[in-house]
Amino acid sequence: VQTGDISEERLNESVRRILTLKEKRGVLNFDPSARTAEKAEEAVGSSLNRDLERKIAAAAVTVVKNEDNTLPFKVQTGDHVLLLGAFENEVPGLNLGMRRLIADGVLPKDTSFVAKNFTKESTLDSLKEDLEKATHIVVISEIGYEGQLDKDFWRTKIPTEIVNYANTNHKKAAVLSISKPYDV
């Protein structure tokens, strides 16, 4: 404002917009002492919290391709789901998601699953035992830049081999593309 780059009117408009949003969200009169660990533990994981998580997640997903109406998976009693992440740090989230889906009745109670990650040392043969047991396969493709699309790059090669295996063996498979959309 002092240098004239932004007018005082423009600054006031921005402040008004921010304050209006804060008022709408109920954070103008934020009282940190009202936020306790007990209240947080009560809210996180609650039905309301879980419903909101699902709505946000559903709004964030874009289905690019759905051949043969594979999605959503129709997991039946006794089915086995294999989830393969590109990195070890993805496995806890995959496990949590499956446990929640089973606990919430979205998947049958006797659905079994394995969540693990593949690495650049992984081969189709090293994953074969898990692939053979699976009725449904979810593999994460995590491509961060265009150069990783090379067919021999492990984060491209392994998901491709897994999907080819699933197609050959009549198993339902989905690729979950995260990171940048180069692999889409």
What are these regions (language model features)?
Residues V1-V184:
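Preference for extracellular/luminal or secreted protein segments
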